[in-house]
């Protein structure tokens, strides 16, 4: 297991109360040895005006996953902040849920890189993201 902080899924989800994460309906669903996953509904909260998943909502899910994964890699007295987010949209989604899978690309002392892939309910890739974070403290 790569994580330096040991939280349960319930504890991870409790951190989202009264935040954008909760408003968008994002829920952490899996914390594996080197992977963090979450789901987000594709509904009125996350749609753009034409009834499709908003690219900004996809980016919010990706940044949420990468930032929390980054936090799990810090020690007491440290935190992470996002420095760069890139998202490539591959497929539109109009309903259901989108699942995000976050894996490390680079875990340095001062910076981290995370790959977050979003999938529709049929398991098709709909967005590929990369988040860079800086370790503070």
UniProtKB/Swiss-Prot annotation:
Its main location: cytoplasm. One of its GO terms (cellular component) is cytosol. GO terms for molecular function: 1,4-dihydroxy-2-naphthoyl-CoA thioesterase activity. It is found in: Cytoplasm. Gene3D superfamilies: Hotdog Thioesterase. Pathway: Siderophore biosynthesis; enterobactin biosynthesis. The active site is at residue 63. Its EC number is 3.1.2.-. One of its GO terms (biological process) is enterobactin biosynthetic process. Keywords: Cytoplasm, Hydrolase. Belongs to the thioesterase PaaI family. This is Proofreading thioesterase EntH. It comes from Salmonella typhimurium (strain LT2 / SGSC1412 / ATCC 700720).
């Amino acid at each position: 297991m790569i994580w330096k902080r040991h939280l349960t899924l319930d504890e991870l989800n409790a951190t989202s109360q009264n935040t954008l994460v909760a408003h968008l309906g994002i829920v952490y669903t899996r914390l594996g040895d080197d992977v963090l996953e979450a789901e987000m509904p594709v509904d009125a909260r996350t749609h753009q005006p034409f009834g499709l998943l908003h690219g900004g909502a996809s980016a919010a899910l990706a940044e949420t996953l990468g930032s929390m994964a980054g936090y799990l890699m810090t020690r007491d007295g440290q935190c992470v902040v996002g420095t760069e987010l890139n998202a490539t949209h591959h497929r539109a989604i109009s309903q259901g849920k989108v699942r995000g899978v976050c894996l490390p690309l680079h875990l340095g002392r001062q910076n981290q890189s995370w790959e977050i892939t979003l999938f529709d309910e049929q398991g098709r890739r709909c967005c590929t993201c990369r988040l860079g974070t800086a370790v503070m403290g």
